[in-house]
């Protein structure tokens, strides 16, 4: 929910609600001018999304009514993944920031010609006719997920809202896909719902999808793209790091994915 006012006015209600609903974690997004208020109420800053509020940073604070939820069980592994990402050459991402990318729209035939995908692969925006196959792929890829991507109707509904879906096909069969949840008011977009089938991983599909989403977002005058990705998954973290995204924090036990709650890394990039 959105709240305008002093955080202390709502902190008690949030704590009571968490107790009633047996919530293990309370998450608060706040602009820079309000960032000290959650701290005075016992909240801890876990990360930042750069330029989230139409150019202003967003500070993410958390409180853990359930103390066990605060424990990161794979911290050492996740720290190693980030260390490896930051150690690798990020020159490509830096160069991309310096370049003035044309905002002119081109057709998808031209984009296909410039694609780095191997022969037989096609990258394109998803359409309504893809929803059934997309839902099936998501249901196979995630045992648990924060949103019902396994439902065709849900995907169709989000297609009509502020969600862009892009996919990679191999001879007409979807092998990789991702989306961008757009916030037009604040001109930010979250790149999410990233999935590649096991036999196609490591071939660079996700990087191409991210690039395509970024291009579309830039053409729509969005300021920033960011992601909250699984902290224990090396591939997806490496993909965002190699594209010039900055690591800006980790949200502990934040999302139900796979077998339970997982830590999520924050990566941000100006468009």
UniProtKB/Swiss-Prot annotation:
Induction: Transcription is induced at high salt concentrations. Forms part of an operon with ablA. It comes from the Archaea. One of its GO terms (molecular function) is N-acetyltransferase activity. Residues 86-122 are annotated as: Disordered. Its EC number is 2.3.1.264. InterPro entries: Acyl_CoA_acyltransferase (IPR016181), GNAT_AblB (IPR022525), GNAT_dom (IPR000182). Belongs to the acetyltransferase family. This is Beta-lysine N(6)-acetyltransferase. The gene is ablB.
């Amino acid at each position: 929910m959105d709240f305008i006012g002093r955080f202390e006015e709502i902190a008690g209600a949030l704590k009571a609600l968490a107790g009633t609903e047996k919530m293990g974690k309370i998450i608060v997004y706040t602009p820079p001018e309000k960032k000290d208020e959650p701290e005075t109420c016992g909240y801890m800053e876990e990360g930042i999304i750069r330029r989230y509020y139409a150019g202003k940073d967003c500070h993410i604070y958390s409180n853990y009514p359930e103390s066990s939820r605060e424990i990161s069980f794979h911290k050492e592994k996740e720290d190693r993944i980030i260390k490896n990402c930051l150690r690798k050459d990020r020159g490509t991402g830096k160069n991309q920031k310096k370049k003035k990318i044309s905002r002119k729209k081109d057709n998808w035939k031209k984009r296909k010609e410039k694609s780095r995908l191997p022969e037989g692969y096609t990258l394109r925006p998803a359409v309504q006719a893809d929803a059934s196959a997309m839902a099936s792929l998501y249901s196979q890829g995630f045992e648990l997920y924060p949103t019902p991507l396994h439902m065709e109707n849900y995907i169709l509904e989000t297609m009509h809202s502020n969600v862009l879906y892009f996919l990679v096909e191999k001879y007409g069969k979807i092998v990789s896909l991702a989306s961008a949840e757009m916030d037009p008011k604040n001109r930010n977009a979250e790149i999410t719902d990233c999935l590649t089938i096991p036999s196609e991983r490591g071939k660079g599909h996700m990087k191409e999808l991210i690039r395509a989403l970024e291009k579309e977002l830039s053409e729509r005058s969005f300021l920033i793209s960011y992601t909250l990705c699984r902290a224990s998954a090396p591939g997806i973290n490496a993909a965002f790091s190699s594209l010039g995204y900055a690591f800006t924090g980790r949200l502990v036990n934040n999302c139900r994915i796979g077998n339970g709650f997982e830590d999520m890394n924050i990566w941000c990039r100006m468009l």
